[in-house]
Amino acid sequence: MALTRFERFLGRLLRAVVWILFAAFKLFAPQQRHGVSRLPPITNPLLLLSAMQLARKIRRKEVTSVEVVQAYIDRIQEVNPLINAMVKDRFSAALQEAAQVDKLIEEETGGEDVLEDRLPLLGVPITVKEAFALQGMPNSTGLLTRRDLVSGADAPSVALLKRAGAIPLGVTNCSELCMWLESHNHLYGITNNPYDFERIVGGSSGGEGSILGAGSSVIGIGSDIGGSIRIPCFFNGIFGHKPSVGIVNNEGQYPPASGQQMGFLCTGPMCRYAEDLIPMLSIMGGPNAEKLSLFTEVDLKKLRFFSVPHNGGSHLVSPVEPQLLHAQKMVVKRLEADLGVKVQELLIPQLKYSFQIWGTMMASPGKDGKPPTTFAELMSEGGKKVWPAWELFKWFLGFSSHTLAAIGLALVELFQSSHPSPFIMQQKESLQQELEELLGTDGVLLYPSHPLIAQKHHHPIFTPFNFSYTGIFNILGLPVTQCPLGLSAEGLPLGVQIVAGKLQDRLSLATALYLEKAFGGWREPGKTTIKP
C-alpha cells in the first residue's frame, strides 16, 4: 500500500522538526569525551569459546572454573571503564563459587555425563540485567529512589541458570525503568557501544548487549517488552531470543508488568554464540520449555521462508538504511543458494501501524479491568509524586533526577486516549491472523531489526518510534531470534530478525545457527578500526 501525498508530507515535516529540535538539544545534552577510540583486543583464548564449549572443558578438567571466571573478571576490569556496562560486580563471591565447582568436579564419581545432565552450565560465568533480582545485588533499574535496594532472592529465571551451574559475575546497566532504547540513567550513567564509544547500545538490556559484544561475558539474561533483548543484540553484534509468550517466568524483575503487559513481556537469553541459545532457553523455560521441542532436529530445506524488507513506510518511523536492506538481501540469496529454497518477498500493509498497535495494546486494561500502572507512577516509586511537565522544566535547569527519555514518555502518556481506536484494533487482529496463517508450523520470516544502524548517543530521542520494528512481535506473541550479519562500512553491527510461528522457536533458532556459519556471527570489536 503506497503512501498518500499527505502522509509523505507529514513524514518530511516530522523529519524537519526532528532536526531542528536536535540542534537545540545539543546545547543542553551532556557531551562525552574518550581518550581511547577502540577496545583492547582479546588476548585470552578462553574468552573466544562458547558457554557450551567452556562447560565441556570444565567438566573434562581441561580448564578450571576459576581460570575461566578469572579470565572474564580480567576482561571486565580492562574494558568496563570504557563501556560502563557492568554497574555492580560480585567478583570475590564468583571466584569462591568457581573454586567450589572445581572441588565438586574433582570429587564427582559419576563421570562427565552425570555432570552434563545435572549441571549443564557448571562453572560457566554469566551476567544479569540489573532489572532482575540477583541475591545481594542492586535492583534499581536506574531509579535514584531505589538506589539502596538490594535483592534478597533470585528471580526465577536467574535461579534456574544458577541451579544449572552458572556463576553470576554481576549486574549490568539498563535504561531508566526499562522503557527506552538507550541504556542511560542518573544512577549509573550511560553505556557505550563496544564498536564505537559514541554510539548507543540499545535498551533496555543495553548493558548486557555491550558487555557481551565486548567479549566480557559469554551468556546473559535480558527482558523484552518492545525489543529490549533484540535491539541491544542488534546494536552490539550478538545473538538474542525473545521466546514465545509464556515460556520463561517473568517474575522477579522491576518494574513488574501490569494491565495486558504480562502477555507481551518476555525473558530470554543473550549470547555471543548461537549454539548457546537453545541450552539457555531450555534451562530458563523449565518445564514449559518442553512445549517448544527445542532438541527436535530442524531440516531447513523443508521450511518456507519469507522476507519483508520494511514496514510499508510509516511516516512515524525512519526508512530502513540501505546497508541493512542489502544485508537482508544477502541472507535471501544465501538461503536460496545453499538450501535450494525459494524465499518469497512480501509487503504486509498492517505493519505500517506497528507503533500505534503497540501503544494501544500496552495501555489496555487487564482482565480485571484495571489500567496498567503509568510511567509517571513508576517514576514516583519510593519518593515524591512526579509531575512530568515540572520534571521537564527541572531537566532544562539541570536539576531533574530523571532522564529526558523517561520524562518524555511520562508526558506522552498524559495525551494518550483511554479508548482504543477501532481501526487500530482491526489492523492488529488482521495482522495477527495473517502472520499466524502465513507462518504456521513451518514458516520463517526475515524482518529488519531496526531501521537504523546504531545511532550516536541521545539521537533516539528524535526517532522515538523506530523500536516498533521489534515491538510489534511482542504484541503478536511470536518468537523472534536476533542474528548478527557482519559489520557495516563504519564498522558497526548489521543484523536481522528471524520470526517463527507460536511455539515454533526451534525454527528461528535453527536458522540463526545456519546464518552464524554463513555470515560469521559475532565479530570481535577490538579488531575493528573505528572511524573518527
Curated annotation (Swiss-Prot):
Catalytic activity: N-(5Z,8Z,11Z,14Z-eicosatetraenoyl)-ethanolamine + H2O = ethanolamine + (5Z,8Z,11Z,14Z)-eicosatetraenoate; (9Z)-octadecenamide + H2O = (9Z)-octadecenoate + NH4(+)
Active-site residues, record numbering mapped to chain: K129 (charge relay system), S204 (charge relay system), S228 (acyl-ester intermediate)
Protein topology in the membrane: Single-pass membrane protein
Keywords: Hydrolase, Lipid degradation, Lipid metabolism, Membrane, Transmembrane, Transmembrane helix
Subcellular location: Membrane
InterPro entries recorded: Amidase_CS (IPR020556), Amidase_dom (IPR023631), AS_sf (IPR036928), FAAH2 (IPR052739)
Entry EC number(s): 3.5.1.99
GO biological process: lipid catabolic process
Residue ranges crossing the lipid bilayer per the database entry: 9-29
Keyword Nucleus: no
GO-annotated cellular components: membrane
Enzyme class: hydrolase
GO-annotated molecular function: fatty acid amide hydrolase activity
Family: Belongs to the amidase family.
Protein name, UniProt field: Fatty-acid amide hydrolase 2-A
